[in-house]
Regions:
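Bacterial N-terminal signal peptides
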Residues: 9-19
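Bacterial N-terminal signal peptides that target proteins for export
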Residues: 1-10
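Short S/T/G/P-rich N-terminal loop/turn motif that feeds into the first structured element of a domain
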Residues: 22-254
Length: 254
């Protein structure tokens, strides 16, 4: 989920500025990312997974709710790095870092230190980054079990074009796939501080893993010829770097 100080600024400039490219999409106004989240990606020690889950369930989540965290999504990687978990929480303003962390607000400094000490014993590696979801390009599916995540990198100067292409070409097909029950939803999010510049994700949500067996939702919704034409255009604006599948953990989310 990676120079961090500049990446959010670069992503914002790429989205907000008009592209100088001559593609058919260059004159369209791309939507601005408007929901920012803080993502933690945690690799656990294999023998400490169950303990970490119990600490999250019994200590961390109650403290987060007490501190006023409004939502949290916890994912485990089904296909990708083993023993890897992701926690996504809202991050509306940077001023959040000027005050106490949620655990400190809820438990006090001593209580938070005790919980963090327990968590550190479970963790092998951990990193974090910001992500900016584009709401106008999102088909919501907040409780979807399965997330198929494609990490992509925009061709320099082409982020604006990619978002316009996605809105004009991809989103209508995904809406049709949603209406027919082939997918639960979808979203696109631009990664910011903590991630490489120009990196973004497209996420397809499914109610279960069997949904992935249907293949490309654009093929299902529009037919092979139309889907191939649409997919071929994406190479003008971005390259795919990684695809993996994650599962939402309901009792570690709220």
């Amino acid at each position: 989920m990676r120079t961090p100080q500049l990446s959010l600024l670069v992503a914002a400039i790429l989205v907000a500025s008009a592209s100088t490219a001559t593609s058919a999409y260059s004159q369209q106004t791309a939507p601005v990312p408007n929901v920012r989240s803080f993502v933690q990606v945690i690799r656990l020690k294999p023998d400490m997974v169950n303990e970490w889950i119990e600490i999250q369930r019994n200590e961390v989540i109650p403290a987060q709710k007490k501190a006023g965290i409004t939502s949290r999504t916890t994912l485990t990687t089904q296909v990708g790095n083993a023993f890897e978990y992701s926690i996504i929480t809202p991050f509306p303003k940077w001023e959040a870092f000027d005050s106490d962390a949620p655990l400190v607000k809820a438990l006090g400094r001593d209580g938070a230190a005790q919980v963090n000490a327990k968590l550190r014993k479970c963790i092998m590696t951990q990193y974090s980054y910001m992500t900016n979801r584009v709401d106008s390009l999102t088909i919501p599916a907040p409780d979807a079990l399965v997330w198929r995540i494609a990490v992509r990198r925009a061709v320099p100067g082409k982020m604006n074009d990619y978002l316009a292409y996605y809105r004009a070409e991809v989103l209508p097909g995904l809406r049709k796939a949603k209406a027919s029950g082939q997918i639960a939803g979808s979203t696109i999010a631009i990664r910011g501080v903590g991630a490489p510049s120009g990196e973004f994700t497209t996420v397809t949500y499914y109610a279960n893993f069997a949904g992935i067996d249907g293949g490309d939702p654009l093929v299902q919704a529009l037919g092979r010829e139309a889907a191939d034409r649409i997919n071929a255009k994406s190479a003008e604006f971005s390259t795919a770097t990684q695809v993996f599948v994650r599962r939402r953990i309901a009792d570690l989310s709220f």
